[in-house]
């Protein structure tokens, strides 16, 4: 026994030295999370102590049993079998092994054996001691004095199915160990015995333990037992395999043998080498019978071996015509929750009946008129027809066309499901003041001015507010008394050209009217009861002052040779001079608009058909005509001077450009967003602009805010021809449209720039008739009163008060 103890101690020392070498690299970070329960590890010192105790017990038992005979041992075994404790199957097998070992011992005692060489002072080993060491149970006495077999605890291996193996030794459960700080023990084992707190060494002992690292040392403490937490050899081997990228499980073979499921040897010889049977070389009797049937049918004419040429051609044509089924491979699809059914066709009316009422049948004139119309302009694609009976109704000729158009509509027009909101429409409208609170503004028609033949293209009220000038397609300019509607003066300027525009000079010290007919601009002094001799003489002096000015000669001298001047200033002729027309200016293209400067010495004309000379500025005191633009982007539509500053606005089809006449530079480009601008007007304050367009929109621009429209209004169903602000200080402006109506607006511009303008539509005036899709062509305001005058395509001008 002493030799065994010495050997065990040597082995423990050798293992300590090996553990030092294995843990020399110290690569164990995070390995504890993969290790098994700490309670399964038993220190080597405890194993040695258990072995020593077992050795001492076995030695004492051997000494006691040596005095008994073999018969006594047999009797003891019989008594053990007759005791209360019945051994299990494993125990009975072990008893049989003991009996067989005893029989073998008796046989060996009978046979002569060689003498064993024994060490001096050492007792010879006894076979009974070896057998007792191999037993896994011990014999104890129970409470009745009988024999009781107590087996050692089973140590399950890794592959065991014992689920209680991983249960920790400390059975206190999920309770913090801090509850046991005041007790000498730290819990209870499975048998209910206290687990005493292990002794802790001092700092020096801890330092020595950290230097002399045992095998499996981790430096951690098991919280359940309070003992050092070390790793076993199997856990160290598992860590090594994980670090080296090997398979941790020893059961699985990383390199299994290849299983050849199919042979790789090519078999060239047949599986059967029997000769071919004779029946394969003899014609078939059954096939011969079938062939003879076909031969008889051909002889009798029941089967034609060759088809007739007509039938073959017909079959070839049928083969060339290939028909495809569009829905052959169509797969059924589940119903889509977002599916929107197609709208249903409207039900047929009385006019689609085969026997409609007589009032639905068209007359001969209506039929001819319907046939002459274009298909796009027809209200219906068919004419009602009467038949005597339903069987006489022919097939519908436009059926395929109608179905095709419906399919195209369904295909090209996507259907959208609109979610309707339960919102009061009145809550979405801005809160505007009542129109009754915004009076005065024109509400009724006061006077109708008749006399022109054809359309009245332009109207203008003089600065004093007593005379009204109109120009029309008949080439005449007429002057009326505003309140009475009486015509007081008329002159025919041109028999071939219409008078496109008339405008008064904006000063009260003169009574000068400018009118444009074709390529000529006429400046005249009409006869009116309000014109005094002094006012008439002052007007003539202003018109005649430019004839003797030297600037006209310089203008002619500065022109290159062979080039005509942009404007020719001359007398209109004796006939027109006698009627009051004193001056004529001829330009290169037809004039559509005239705009005066606020001081009355300059006015601008616009000729949309002219390229470079579309915009011209004329100086009345010098008889000078100038072309300010060498190149203009787009076709000019109209122009206007700023009411307060030296700014000049020019409107093209899509934009309005603002130029500084002093600095001669472009200041701003206003983008209304309209397709075609028809007219515009500048607010008397100079910071706002209103634009009318042929696409039925009226746009308000705040020049200080942005170059985009501040507000867009759509109140007309046709194009807007003219817009005009009230120049007398009233917050009113109006527009004229081809639908025959005028829309009056209240547009208040506050002095505080932080406030937005207030725009309220207050009245729609209707009175003009629409002729050839033309309605109201021009509009002008009274200089002081809330009155306006409109010119219409019906040949009348109307005063609204």
Curated annotation (Swiss-Prot):
<keyword id="KW-0539">Nucleus</keyword>
<feature type="region of interest" description="Disordered">
    <location>
        <begin position="358"/>
        <end position="377"/>
    </location>
</feature>
<feature type="repeat" description="WD 7">
    <location>
        <begin position="771"/>
        <end position="801"/>
    </location>
</feature>
<dbReference type="InterPro" id="IPR028598">
    <property type="entry name" value="BOP1/Erb1"/>
</dbReference>
<dbReference type="InterPro" id="IPR036322">
    <property type="entry name" value="WD40_repeat_dom_sf"/>
</dbReference>
<feature type="region of interest" description="Disordered">
    <location>
        <begin position="1"/>
        <end position="135"/>
    </location>
</feature>
<dbReference type="InterPro" id="IPR019775">
    <property type="entry name" value="WD40_repeat_CS"/>
</dbReference>
<dbReference type="Pfam" id="PF08145">
    <property type="entry name" value="BOP1NT"/>
</dbReference>
<feature type="repeat" description="WD 6">
    <location>
        <begin position="715"/>
        <end position="755"/>
    </location>
</feature>
<feature type="compositionally biased region" description="Basic and acidic residues">
    <location>
        <begin position="91"/>
        <end position="113"/>
    </location>
</feature>
<keyword id="KW-0698">rRNA processing</keyword>
<dbReference type="InterPro" id="IPR015943">
    <property type="entry name" value="WD40/YVTN_repeat-like_dom_sf"/>
</dbReference>
<feature type="region of interest" description="Disordered">
    <location>
        <begin position="546"/>
        <end position="570"/>
    </location>
</feature>
<feature type="compositionally biased region" description="Basic and acidic residues">
    <location>
        <begin position="362"/>
        <end position="377"/>
    </location>
</feature>
<keyword id="KW-0853">WD repeat</keyword>
<feature type="repeat" description="WD 1">
    <location>
        <begin position="451"/>
        <end position="490"/>
    </location>
</feature>
<feature type="repeat" description="WD 3">
    <location>
        <begin position="586"/>
        <end position="628"/>
    </location>
</feature>
<keyword id="KW-0677">Repeat</keyword>
<dbReference type="GO" id="GO:0000466">
    <property type="term" value="P:maturation of 5.8S rRNA from tricistronic rRNA transcript (SSU-rRNA, 5.8S rRNA, LSU-rRNA)"/>
</dbReference>
<dbReference type="GO" id="GO:0043021">
    <property type="term" value="F:ribonucleoprotein complex binding"/>
</dbReference>
<dbReference type="GO" id="GO:0030687">
    <property type="term" value="C:preribosome, large subunit precursor"/>
</dbReference>
<feature type="repeat" description="WD 4">
    <location>
        <begin position="631"/>
        <end position="669"/>
    </location>
</feature>
<dbReference type="GO" id="GO:0005654">
    <property type="term" value="C:nucleoplasm"/>
</dbReference>
<feature type="repeat" description="WD 2">
    <location>
        <begin position="494"/>
        <end position="534"/>
    </location>
</feature>
<keyword id="KW-0690">Ribosome biogenesis</keyword>
<comment type="subunit">
    <text>Component of the NOP7 complex, composed of ERB1, NOP7 and YTM1. The complex is held together by ERB1, which interacts with NOP7 via its N-terminal domain and with YTM1 via a high-affinity interaction between the seven-bladed beta-propeller domains of the 2 proteins. The NOP7 complex associates with the 66S pre-ribosome.</text>
</comment>
<dbReference type="Pfam" id="PF00400">
    <property type="entry name" value="WD40"/>
</dbReference>
<feature type="compositionally biased region" description="Basic and acidic residues">
    <location>
        <begin position="124"/>
        <end position="135"/>
    </location>
</feature>
<dbReference type="InterPro" id="IPR012953">
    <property type="entry name" value="BOP1_N_dom"/>
</dbReference>
<dbReference type="InterPro" id="IPR001680">
    <property type="entry name" value="WD40_rpt"/>
</dbReference>
<dbReference type="GO" id="GO:0070545">
    <property type="term" value="C:PeBoW complex"/>
</dbReference>
<comment type="function">
    <text>Component of the NOP7 complex, which is required for maturation of the 25S and 5.8S ribosomal RNAs and formation of the 60S ribosome.</text>
</comment>
<dbReference type="GO" id="GO:0000463">
    <property type="term" value="P:maturation of LSU-rRNA from tricistronic rRNA transcript (SSU-rRNA, 5.8S rRNA, LSU-rRNA)"/>
</dbReference>
<feature type="repeat" description="WD 5">
    <location>
        <begin position="672"/>
        <end position="711"/>
    </location>
</feature>
<protein>
    <recommendedName>
        <fullName>Ribosome biogenesis protein ERB1</fullName>
    </recommendedName>
</protein>
<comment type="similarity">
    <text>Belongs to the WD repeat BOP1/ERB1 family.</text>
</comment>
<feature type="compositionally biased region" description="Acidic residues">
    <location>
        <begin position="35"/>
        <end position="90"/>
    </location>
</feature>
<keyword id="KW-0175">Coiled coil</keyword>
